[in-house]
C-alpha cells in the first residue's frame, strides 16, 4: 500500500536553524515517518525518491508554515466538561470542587465523549501529543479501556498516566489535620479512596499498564502519582522502581501553591518535597514535574542537575491564584522546560499558543526586571522538543527531521487569526 505524502513548498520551522526566517522546503512522509526534508522532493529523480513509487498524495504547502506538532505536556481529560465552570479560586478550594473525587462515578459513554471532546480541541489547536494524567475514580480497568479506545478513535498521540493518590488533598493542606481527624478528611474531599482499603493501588496500575503496552502505536504510558505528598512515603521508592523497570516516565505535581510549600516545610525531610523525592530515588530524566511555582533556586538547580523535566502551566496557575513560576531562574540553571495547558476547569482552553504567550510575557513583569524574559523561540522549543523529552518521546516527535514521526501542523499564513 502506497501511503506516501508529499508536502511541497512549505516554510519549515527549524528551531536549530533560522527560526525567524524559515526556509522553504518539501517534506516527504512515508508510513507516518518523515523520510526527507529539503527542496526538489517533487522531482521523481531526486535521490530521496530512489526506488519509491510516486506519492499517493501531494499537498500544496506554499501558503503554510510547517511546525512540529505541539506537545501538551500536562493535561487532565477528566474535567473537560467543566470548562468555564469556575471563577478564580485558590488551588486548595478548587481541588474540592473540580476533580473526580468531588462528583459521582461517571457513565462510560460520558468518559468516551469527554475524551473525544478534549482530544478534538487539542488537535484543532495544533496539539498532536497529550500527556493525560487522567483520574478514573474508583479505579476500574473497564473505564480505563473506554478512555484509551476514545484516544484511538481520535487519532491523537497520548502518553497516558493513571492519576492516583493515597491520601486526600485535605491531608496536605497545612494544619487542617489539627482541626479535622484524618479519618474524616476523605468525606471533606467528596469520595472514598480510589482503591479498596488494603488494596495495593500501585500494583494494580502497573499490571494495567503492562497489559496494555504496545497495543496501539499512538498510546504509551507513564505513572501519575498526584503529588509526592499525596502518596504514602513508602510508595515513592516503589514508584521509582516501577518507572525504571518499565522504562516509563513519572508525571506528578510539584510546589503548585504556597500551601504545598508550607506543608513541605513542616512535614518533609529537610523541609523540601524535592529532598523527599531524592531520598526515594525519583530524581532523574524520567521525572516530569508540573507547575513548580514555588521552588527555591537551590531546588531548581538540583532538579536541573538531575535532568528532571519542569512543565509550566502559566495560564492555569493564574486562575487557581497559585502565582507565576520562576522562569528566569529555571532558564539560568539550564532546566529542561516544557509547557502544558492543565485542567480544562482551570485553564478553560487547551491552547498552547496562549501558554506560549504567557511563558514569554509573565516573566517580563516578574522576577528581576533587568533580566530579559524568554524569547518566542524558547517558547516554541518548550512546546515541542521540550515537551517530547518530558513525556518520554524525545527523538520521536518534537522536530521536523528525517526519522521523526510525522506529527506536523500546517499553519495557514493567509489566515489573519
Predicted regions and their residues:
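Alpha-helical scaffold segments that flank or form the walls of functional sites
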Residues: 83-157, 200-216
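Conserved short loop/turn motifs at secondary-structure junctions
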Residues: 133-140, 224-229, 318
Amino acid at each position: 500500500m502506497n501511503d506516501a505524502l508529499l508536502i511541497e513548498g512549505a516554510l519549515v520551522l527549524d528551531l536549530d536553524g533560522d527560526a525567524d526566517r524559515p526556509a522553504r522546503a518539501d517534506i516527504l512522509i512515508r508510513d507516518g515517518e518523515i523520510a526527507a526534508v529539503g527542496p526538489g522532493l517533487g522531482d521523481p529523480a531526486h535521490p530521496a525518491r530512489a526506488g519509491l513509487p510516486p506519492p499517493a498524495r501531494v499537498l500544496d504547502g506554499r501558503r503554510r508554515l510547517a511546525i512540529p506538532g505541539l506537545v501538551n505536556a500536562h493535561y487532565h481529560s477528566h474535567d473537560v466538561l467543566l470548562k468555564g465552570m469556575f471563577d478564580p479560586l485558590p488551588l486548595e478550594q478548587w481541588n474540592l470542587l473540580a476533580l473526580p473525587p468531588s462528583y459521582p462515578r461517571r457513565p462510560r459513554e460520558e468518559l468516551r465523549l469527554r475524551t473525544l471532546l478534549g482530544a478534538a480541541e487539542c488537535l484543532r489547536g495544533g496539539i498532536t501529543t497529550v500527556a493525560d494524567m487522567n483520574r478514573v475514580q474508583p479505579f476500574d480497568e473497564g473505564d480505563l479501556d473506554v478512555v484509551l479506545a476514545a484516544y484511538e478513535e481520535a487519532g491523537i498521540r497520548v502518553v497516558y498516566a493513571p492519576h492516583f493518590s493515597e491520601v486526600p488533598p485535605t491531608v496536605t493542606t497545612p494544619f487542617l489535620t489539627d482541626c479535622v481527624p484524618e479519618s474524616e478528611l476523605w468525606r471533606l474531599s467528596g469520595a472514598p479512596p480510589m482503591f479498596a482499603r488494603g488494596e495495593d493501588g500501585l500494583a494494580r496500575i502497573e499490571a494495567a499498564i503492562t497489559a496494555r503496552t504496545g497495543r496501539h502505536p499512538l498510546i504509551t504510558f507513564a505513572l501519575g502519582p498526584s503529588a509526592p505528598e499525596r502518596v504514602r512515603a513508602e510508595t515513592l521508592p516503589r514508584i521509582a522502581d516501577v518507572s525504571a523497570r518499565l522504562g516509563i516516565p513519572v508525571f506528578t505535581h510539584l510546589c503548585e501553591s504556597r500551601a504545598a510549600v508550607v506543608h513541605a516545610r513542616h512535614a518533609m525531610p529537610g523541609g523540601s518535597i524535592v529532598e523527599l523525592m531524592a531520598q526515594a530515588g525519583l530524581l532523574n530524566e524520567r521525572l516530569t514535574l508540573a507547575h513548580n511555582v514555588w521552588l527555591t533556586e537551590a531546588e531548581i538547580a538540583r532538579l536541573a542537575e538531575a535532568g528532571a523535566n519542569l512543565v509550566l502551566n502559566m495560564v492555569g496557575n493564574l486562575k487557581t491564584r497559585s502565582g507565576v513560576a520562576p522562569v528566569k531562574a529555571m532558564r539560568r540553571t539550564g532546566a529542561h522546560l516544557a509547557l502544558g495547558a492543565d485542567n480544562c476547569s482551570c485553564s478553560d482552553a487547551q491552547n498552547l499558543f496562549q501558554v506560549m504567550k504567557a511563558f514569554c510575557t509573565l516573566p517580563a513583569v516578574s522576577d528581576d526586571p533587568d533580566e530579559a524574559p524568554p524569547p518566542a523561540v524558547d517558547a516554541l522549543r518548550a512546546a515541542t522538543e521540550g515537551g517530547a523529552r518530558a513525556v518520554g518521546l524525545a527523538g520521536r516527535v518534537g522536530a521536523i527531521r528525517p526519522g521523526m514521526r510525522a506529527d506536523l501542523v500546517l499553519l495557514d499564513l493567509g489566515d489573519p487569526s
